[in-house]
């Protein structure tokens, strides 16, 4: 849609959007005042977003203002611009005001102007940067590290050894009161679905610590071996957070399993991790439905299960003979209630959590988090999302995925409060919780935002306490995120992209930089990015271009092992070198724009991201090839829509005979969807089907899916190639 420039907009243009005459007249007067008083489009947009726009105005008017303001501006429209005074009060701003000249010398100017230089400093001076951040986070070591980074000279571990010699316990760091907080600070605010008109529940640091200690004592009473793997397959609620911290405090290793998994998927993860026990819930309550969870754990032939009731104090079904109810489990340590549990301090490289890639029919990668990974999560939150004491951080997620543990560490280590809604995040009850819990940092994924906008489920709720949004999981859409910003009076969206194997992000945004929608403004602190050209050579720094993203191998908190795979082969083998260092593979296609922003373009290999779940093309093709006898072969392609947003699944079909050249593609699409959802994942959906006389192939007969992706992106999803 073509938008008028701001000075061309008339009262009738505004009225055409459904705004009354009187209101339209006032809006136009205010707009004219702003235009006359501003010199640049960003300055104009700042004033419009502060003085004119509010959530009750039609979104079409927000779009008229945004696109009208930046008409003829070019790419990368700034949707949010930092205020220098506010920027100086952020975590990084305060640090730079105090020590900027020490770090950057005469090049230091102010937190906003010097942030990019500070990011580069964090890469070139890891000893100084990470020691500073660990001090800012008040990280407690029972034995301090000999140094920050011990680089590898053998070539076996290109990422080097971080914090060598250090001993610590991440859970202890979550539960310690110090200069960042007091024992009476509220550290969890939560609400159960169905109790939406009741006050928000709260838990203080003192209460959380007491309950974690009790659960850790009860774990010790089970008599498990040291450093046993213990699974958690539960919704993200207060009990699961207590359990997670207790496992880590006791020196065991959490095995993260998503509460949506089938018995087969649960079983696979239990076997890979060699879990000795599992915490689960009897059922998951969503509205008037009770979804079985313990039953799936039993069908997975799980080891000893400790079962938490979803409601009340007793489970809804009979347990297996050796399984324990939550109450009976805690009862084993009833005499130790209120007694401190002395944390099990472990080496920095010891495992604390086993997480998994989102494998479907293939075996998922088992990725161990060490005791350093939680520090990376907390440091990212400190720097990029500016999480501080007094913040309430909410992020709809699950302990089965990395953002669950991330939320625990990002909030508690930074002295903030977690906001947990035990229910669906898609409807108005979650929006009400955000209001009532006074959430200040709200994490989202684009598909949730799309649902909110389409259902108007946030209408009428006050989100003015929000300071910033975080977004992860999949590519976002510009207009959907413009709408999201408008719900909170144009607070920024910080895009956050990394991976389970990173422990956080490698690319993000910052509250010290202008933020463009659906774009990243900076490499994460301590990370250096490379965009590779067609010959796998890094393009010049700061040059615009598109290519596969590679990473500097030295990343604090990143993985160095896989339980069921060759880590070097997966992440380093075959990668180019830069200044004598082999680069780390990530696998996404990224664009660096002429203005220095980054945009994600999906997977560079034959993997795609569907609704935040990575899946291989071959897995989908195997299903589609057997759907109909007329199909010779298929290619599954993830294609980003023209307006941005999550990849859409397109199936390119080659038929066995020319007589099938005009089939009913809608019927075929329904068949593909039915089989894919049955055999792979109920959340996967085919967006369109296209026909081809043959698939493009390399000289070695490999399907060139990247070529198909480029053609589909250029011609549109419904074209016949």
Curated annotation (Swiss-Prot):
Motif Microbody targeting signal location, chain numbering: 719-721
Annotated EC: 6.2.1.-
Record's GO cellular component terms: peroxisome
Broad class of enzyme this protein falls into: ligase
Gene Ontology biological process: fatty acid metabolic process
Domain of life: Eukaryota
Tissue expression per record: Expressed in leaves, stems and developing seeds.
Broad class of the protein's primary localization: other
SUPFAM superfamilies reported for this sequence: Acetyl-CoA synthetase-like (SSF56801)
Keyword field: Fatty acid metabolism, Ligase, Lipid metabolism, Peroxisome
Molecular function terms, GO-annotated: ligase activity
Keyword Lipid metabolism: yes
Signal peptide: none
Keyword Ligase tagged: yes
Reported phenotype of the disruption mutant: No visible phenotype under normal growth conditions.
Pfam short name (any one): AMP-binding_C
Compartments, record wording: Peroxisome
Known function: May act as an acid--thiol ligase that activates carboxylic acids by forming acyl-CoAs.
Similarity remark: Belongs to the ATP-dependent AMP-binding enzyme family.
This protein's name: Probable acyl-activating enzyme 17, peroxisomal
């Amino acid at each position: 849609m073509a938008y008028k420039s701001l000075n061309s907009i008339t009262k009738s243009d505004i009225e055409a959007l459904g705004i009354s005459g009187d209101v339209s007249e006032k809006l136009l007067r205010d707009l004219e005042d702003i235009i006359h008083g501003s010199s640049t489009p960003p300055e104009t947009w700042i004033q419009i977003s502060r003085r004119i726009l509010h959530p009750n105005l039609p979104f079409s008017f927000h779009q008229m203002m945004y696109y009208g303001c930046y008409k003829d501006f070019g790419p990368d429209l700034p949707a949010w611009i930092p205020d220098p005074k506010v920027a100086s009060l952020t975590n990084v701003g305060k640090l730079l005001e105090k020590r900027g000249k020490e770090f950057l010398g005469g090049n230091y100017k102010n937190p906003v102007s010097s942030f990019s230089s500070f990011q580069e400093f964090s890469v070139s001076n890891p000893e100084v940067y990470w020691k500073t951040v660990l001090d800012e986070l008040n990280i407690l070591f029972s034995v301090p590290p000999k140094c920050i980074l011990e680089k590898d000279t053998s070539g076996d571990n290109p990422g080097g050894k971080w914090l060598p010699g250090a001993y610590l316990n991440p859970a202890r760091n979550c539960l310690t009161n110090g200069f960042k907080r007091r024992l009476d600070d509220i550290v969890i605010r939560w609400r159960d679905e169905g109790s939406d008109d009741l006050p928000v529940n709260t838990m203080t640091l003192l209460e959380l610590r007491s309950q974690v200690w009790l659960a850790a004592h009860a774990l010790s009473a089970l008599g498990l071996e040291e450093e046993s793997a213990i699974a958690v397959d539960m919704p993200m609620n207060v009990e699961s957070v207590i359990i997670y911290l207790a496992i880590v405090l006791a020196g065991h290793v959490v095995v993260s399993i998503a509460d949506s998994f089938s018995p087969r998927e649960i079983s696979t993860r239990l076997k890979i991790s060699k879990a000795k026990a599992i915490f689960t819930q009897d059922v998951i309550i969503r509205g008037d439905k009770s979804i079985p969870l313990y039953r799936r754990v039993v069908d997975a032939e799980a080891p000893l299960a400790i079962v938490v009731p979803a409601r009340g104090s007793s489970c809804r079904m009979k347990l297996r003979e050796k399984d324990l109810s939550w109450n009976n489990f805690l009862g084993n340590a009833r005499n130790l209630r209120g007694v401190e549990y002395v944390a099990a301090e472990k080496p920095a490289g010891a495992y604390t959590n086993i997480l998994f890639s989102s494998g479907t029919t293939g075996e998922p990668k088992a990725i161990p988090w060490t005791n350093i990974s939680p520090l990376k999560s907390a440091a990212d939150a400190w720097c990029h999302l500016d999480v501080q004491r007094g913040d309430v951080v909410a992020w709809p997620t699950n302990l089965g995925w990395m953002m669950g543990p991330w939320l625990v560490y990002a909030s508690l280590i930074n002295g903030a409060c977690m906001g947990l809604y035990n229910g669906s995040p898609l409807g108005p009850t979650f929006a009400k919780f955000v209001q009532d819990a006074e959430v200040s940092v709200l994490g989202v994924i684009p598909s949730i935002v799309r649902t909110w906008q389409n259902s108007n489920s946030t209408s009428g709720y006050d989100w003015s306490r929000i300071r910033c949004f975080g977004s992860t999981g999949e590519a976002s859409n510009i207009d959907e995120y413009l709408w999201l910003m408008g719900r909170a009076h144009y607070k920024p969206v910080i895009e956050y992209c990394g991976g389970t194997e990173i422990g956080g992000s490698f690319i993000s945004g910052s509250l010290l930089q202008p933020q463009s929608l659906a774009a990243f403004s900076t490499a994460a602190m301590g990370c250096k990015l490379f965009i590779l050209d067609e010959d796998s050579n890094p393009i010049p720094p700061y040059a615009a271009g598109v290519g596969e993203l590679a990473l500097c191998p030295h990343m604090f908190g990143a993985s160095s092992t896989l339980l069921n795979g060759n880590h070097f082969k997966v992440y380093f083998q075959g990668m180019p070198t830069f200044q004598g260092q082999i680069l780390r593979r990530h696998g996404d296609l990224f664009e660096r724009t002429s203005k220095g922003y980054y945009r994600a373009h999906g997977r560079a290999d034959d993997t795609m991201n569907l609704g935040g779940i990575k899946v291989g093309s071959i897995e989908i093709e195997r299903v589609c090839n057997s759907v109909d006898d007329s199909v010779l072969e298929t290619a599954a392609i993830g294609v980003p829509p023209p307006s941005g947003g999550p990849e859409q699944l397109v199936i390119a079909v080659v038929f066995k005979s020319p007589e099938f050249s005009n089939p009913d593609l809608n019927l075929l699409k329904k068949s593909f969807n039915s089989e894919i959802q049955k055999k792979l994942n109920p959340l996967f959906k085919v967006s369109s089907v296209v026909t081809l006389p043959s698939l493009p192939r390399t000289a070695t007969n490999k399907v060139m899916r990247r070529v198909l992706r480029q053609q589909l992106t250029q011609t549109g999803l419904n074209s016949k190639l």
